[in-house]
Structures are given as structure tokens and as C-alpha cells.
Design a protein with these regions (language model features):
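ATP-dependent adenylation/nucleotidyltransferase module used to activate substrates
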Residues: 3-163
């Protein structure tokens, strides 16, 4: 097993890569931040938002926001609404959502966001957790998969082009 020379992340982390010097892709991405033209990225984002507004279909929602209950996804939903979009908030329930996370999700609902929550069968989740632990070394692997796939499935099902 390899470990990153900077942060010690192990090579068992899914999708992690290492350069020839033994530095992981996450650290390389972080180190590249000063080279990002943030104004250009903001302009590109606003152009996407404008295009979504122009292409508005009969669909009620303009975009899907994967919501975890944390501050980042809450901010994203609020910011998108501020920019004039109507997001559909989607959660793939985890078995360890904190009380604060639950409160943040309730807060979004109280503010009028449409919200869909997917919860897996507890018996199936238990089996998948075991498989994740034994085969990948990550008991939360099934949650990672659902967090990344459920919002995409919802977007496809409802014909929403922006996630």
C-alpha cells in the first residue's frame, strides 16, 4: 500500500492517484488552486445559469442539488435560488446523519425547496456495508455510491440537465 508523501492518504482510497513523486491527486489539485482563474470560472458558471434559464422547459426544476445536510449543499441550494433557478434538492440517506444535518434539511424544506429523499432497505444496506468493508475496505462504500448516483438518476428521470 502507498501513502501520499504530503497528507498520508492511502492508495486504497477509491479514485486516488499518485504522481511520480508520491503526491496524491487531491494534494496536487489543492496545490493548483492559485493557478485557477476564479473570475473566468464565475463567468462560465453564470453563462451556464443564463442558458438554463433560457432553456426552461415545462419542467418545474432547473437543476438538481445533492443535499447532505451540511453547510455546503445548503449554501449551493440557496445560491442557486438567489441566481433565479429552482433547484430540486435530493438526498440519499446515510445511516449516520447528524442532528444538525437533519435540522439543515428541515430548514431547506421550510424555505420552500422541493426535496426528495431516498432511503435504502436496511437489510440490503447492511449486506452492502459488509461487502464494501470486505472488498474495498470502506464500510461506507454503498453510501458513497448512492450519494453520487441517486442525484444523477433523479436528474435523468425528471429531464433536468444541470446537477
Amino acid at each position: 500500500m502507498k501513502y501520499c508523501k504530503n497528507c498520508l492518504i492511502p492508495s486504497t482510497k477509491p479514485h486516488i492517484t499518485f504522481n511520480d513523486e508520491g503526491v496524491c491527486s487531491a494534494c496536487l489539485s489543492y496545490l493548483n488552486r492559485p493557478n485557477i482563474d476564479w473570475k473566468k470560472r464565475e463567468d462560465l458558471f453564470l453563462k451556464i445559469v443564463d442558458q438554463v434559464k433560457k432553456d426552461k422547459k415545462k419542467n418545474n426544476w432547473d437543476c438538481v442539488v445533492p443535499v447532505s445536510g451540511g453547510k455546503d449543499s445548503t449554501y449551493q441550494a440557496l445560491k442557486l435560488r438567489e441566481l433565479g433557478l429552482n433547484p430540486l434538492c435530493v438526498t440519499s440517506t446515510t445511516c449516520d446523519l447528524s442532528e444538525l444535518g437533519k435540522k439543515n434539511i428541515e430548514n431547506l424544506k421550510q424555505q420552500g425547496f422541493d426535496y426528495i429523499e431516498f432511503t435504502s432497505n436496511p437489510k440490503v444496506r447492511k449486506k452492502l456495508n459488509r461487502i464494501g468493508l470486505e472488498m474495498i475496505g470502506d464500510i461506507s462504500w454503498p453510501e458513497h455510491i448512492s450519494i453520487n448516483t441517486i442525484p444523477i438518476n433523479v436528474a435523468v428521470k425528471f429531464g433536468i440537465n444541470l446537477i
